[in-house]
Amino acid sequence: MKMADAKQKRNEQLKRWIGSETDLEPPVVKRKKTKVKFDDGAVFLAACSSGDTEEVLRLLERGADINYANVDGLTALHQACIDDNVDMVKFLVENGANINQPDNEGWIPLHAAASCGYLDIAEYLISQGAHVGAVNSEGDTPLDIAEEEAMEELLQNEVNRQGVDIEAARKEEERIMLRDARQWLNSGHINDVRHAKSGGTALHVAAAKGYTEVLKLLIQARYDVNIKDYDGWTPLHAAAHWGKEEACRILVENLCDMEAVNKVGQTAFDVADEDILGYLEELQKKQNLLHSEKREKKSPLIESTANLDNNQTQKTFKNKETLIMEQEKNASSIESLEHEKADEEEEGKKDESSCSSEEEEDDDSESEAETDKAKTLANANTTSTQSASMTAPSVAGGQGTPTSPLKKFPTSTTKVSPKEEERKDESPASWRLGLRKTGSYGALAEITASKEAQKEKDSAGVIRSASSPRLSSSLDNKEKEKDGKGTRLAYVAPTIPRRLASTSDIDEKENRDSSASSIRSGSSYARRKWEEDVKKNSLNEGPTSLNTSYQRSGSFGRRQDDLVSSNVPSTASTVTSSAGLQKTLPASANTTTKSTTGSTSAGVQSSTSNRLWAEDSTEKEKDSVPTAVTVPVAPSVVNAAATTTAMTTATSGTVSSTSEVRERRRSYLTPVRDEESESQRKARSRQARQSRRSTQGVTLTDLQEAEKTIGRSRSTRTREQENEEKEKEEKEKQDKEKQEEKKESETKDDDYRQRYSRTVEEPYHRYRPTSTSTSTSSTSSLSTSTSSLSSSSQLNRPNSLIGITSAYSRSGTKESEREGGKKEEEKEEDKSQPKSIRERRRPREKRRSTGVSFWTQDSDENEQEHQSDSEEGTNKKETQSDSLSRYDTGSLSVSSGDRYDSAQGRSGSQSYLEDRKPYCSRLEKEDSTDFKKLYEQILAENEKLKAQLHDTNMELTDLKLQLEKTTQRQERFADRSLLEMEKRVSGKSQYLLGGKKSSRKKDI
């Protein structure tokens, strides 16, 4: 029945199964399409890191790029070098991997092998042609990064063998950039190519690395100072982030936008290095002064036309600047400028001696200027007609900063000449690799607060015109104050020293021959030089020599009393609106420069003086300290007769109210997202890459903690060594004192035997050697116990535990000594009662004389023993074990003597008592003096021992705490390394799974 029921149930189950969803499924398992698709490059990198050469070959056959780089710029060869996979390194190099491929920070595979200390990989890479002089973004070669001595020796030998100049290799990038910048300046157009990933330009690289000469040339070539990369960073962002003060100053003097924000809403202040924040704020105040004066004055434009003949006799000084000077005389609020004027006069007196030599060269350079005149005039006419079709650039003070949104240079970024491409490939640390930015300073949450604080600071100051660069002159005092306080130090990359005067002269010749006459913009030094020239010429040549058109520095208006204000009206050049206004005014307001014919003599003198000022400034730079203000080089357009100096200097005026400034400066940006910014993500990836480079995943904090623990262990070792030396000295002292005591005890025993042989009977003779033997045995046992305790601390232990064991041994010996002291005190207390009996008995002896007189010999012996007691009292600095051994001998002999006396007293032999009394009385005196001094010694030594015990207990607790901390650290490090290993293993397994799935899919 049961079987039938079971079969029936089974049949019912089969009927239900037929037609069910499971039955309808096909026997072959359907493969679902994988939703996750990995990049081919990521699959290739995962295969290389796993060491699967067959898979790597298959991927290469399918067209995978062997030089594919991840987000950090690391290639498979980099990763193989970091992982110490020699086979994969050889496999990749044999299959055509670029052995000198740099990552985002300029590290080539040899850098990675050198930092990790893999000698075999480094030797193989060098044998295959790796460049030992390659420099990363921070200016480090593989030799600089190497830490192990063997690696340093290998790389140094290779550098010597190849004859590589390390310093030249470090400056190679700047040299290449200088060459390119000169070519662009001479050709008149810029062939810069943005970095493929970051979008960085040559101006970004020069600003971030502090290449000031390159920066000046690029700005002189009309490079846009506000150009942005793909993250929205301007060159000022880069210079501020990497702490390059000189680059920041040059950019601000050329009127870059200091309020420009990147893609995540950060200004240059938000990403700046902490050390230069104050300097940036000072620069912003000075730039705001320029902008505010420009806005408030809005001085009228002057147009005047005249022919060449009239210009030769008329004065050319009556132009826009003299009108502004006349307005400045009536202005009421120029007190702040008067302070700066006084400072400038003091500096001018200091520089008179250096100015005199350049003034003498003025006449010599005039003939040279006449030869260049024809070329410059022809070029100037073409440039002025070209600029008329665009928004008018500001040509003031030799500053060629494009101020309109349009770029002032043709950007031919699509095609590059083959020579340029070859040079790019050859350069080992090419600046076109770009810079990596980190968001380590200036989080998104701080942006709004920093902007509000900046608005409040800037609203209080007077704002100055954009086209009059007053920064360089007004920064002189600040630069000198900085020299007194100590120069600021940049922390990112080494600052390249300035060019010498010879190279600057070559640059000037190249610039004059190829393009419109390039004149260094007037710094405060150039302004003082011009004023000295004016004074000298006014004394020698008369008023007509004052009419030469000249470069004017930003501090114009401070010395208006020195200048002639009643000049005859003459021809002048039309002046464009300022750079600050070009952003706010409509395009129609931007007038073009209408060039007029000027005096040939004026043109000659202006070019001569301008060139002289440039040479003076370069010589000044060469002799000055590194923080001295350098002069940015920029071209000015020379007319058919006169230099068009589009100077719109404005001085005082009513300062706009803070509310107007805030309205004008209010930010209308969209609110920033709370998500992680690109710069923060890059910062985290950089940190992860640093931990990947070292195979153990050790971070900087771990290294610092390790150094601290090493320092502590060294200090404990030195302590332990000192303790061991002290113990050795104590042992030597103990041995010497024991030998002396043995000798003294033997001599005393001999004396006693000789002196008392007549009176003391045979029982006492039998007893005496036993007492001495017990005393000596007790001393030997005590000394052996102490020596064994001290020697136990000298066992072979690890260094970290020596201090603890020695402390334990010291405390053990001290405890044993304390126990011995307690026993002796108990013995003393036991003896106090018989002592009092003897004292009562003593006057009876004197009262009842038995006819036996005291020996004179006894008194002599007492004196000797007093001397010995005093000697013992002076030796209080002896160790505890020695004092205890001496104390034991005395106490044992005394106690045995007491027992013997009591036994003889009971026997009642009067004759023996009478014979024994002299010795007893002498022994009692000896006992009383010995015990007092010994008791005092023991008390003092007990106090010392208590203090030492307290110290050792404190040391012991400290050592226990340190031991617990070290064990916790080791456990924490072990856990951390395990977690990192698990993460890596899981990540690699995911990559492998994804790669295998994709390969299976392709196979299917």
Curated annotation (Swiss-Prot):
GO biological process: neuron projection morphogenesis; regulation of cell adhesion; signal transduction
Any one of the GO CC terms: cytoplasm
Composition bias, Basic and acidic residues: 291-300, 318-329, 336-353, 417-427, 476-486, 528-538, 613-624, 672-681, 717-765, 812-837, 864-880
Single GO molecular function: myosin phosphatase regulator activity
Segments for region (Important for interaction with PPP1CB): 35-38
Xref: Gene3D superfamilies: 6.10.140.390, 6.10.250.1820, Ankyrin repeat-containing domain
Residues annotated with Phosphothreonine modification: 695, 850
Tissue specificity remark: Detected in brain, lung, aorta, heart, gizzard, stomach, oviduct, spleen, kidney and small intestine.
Protein name per Swiss-Prot or TrEMBL: Protein phosphatase 1 regulatory subunit 12A
Lineage of origin: Eukaryota, Metazoa, Chordata, Craniata, Vertebrata
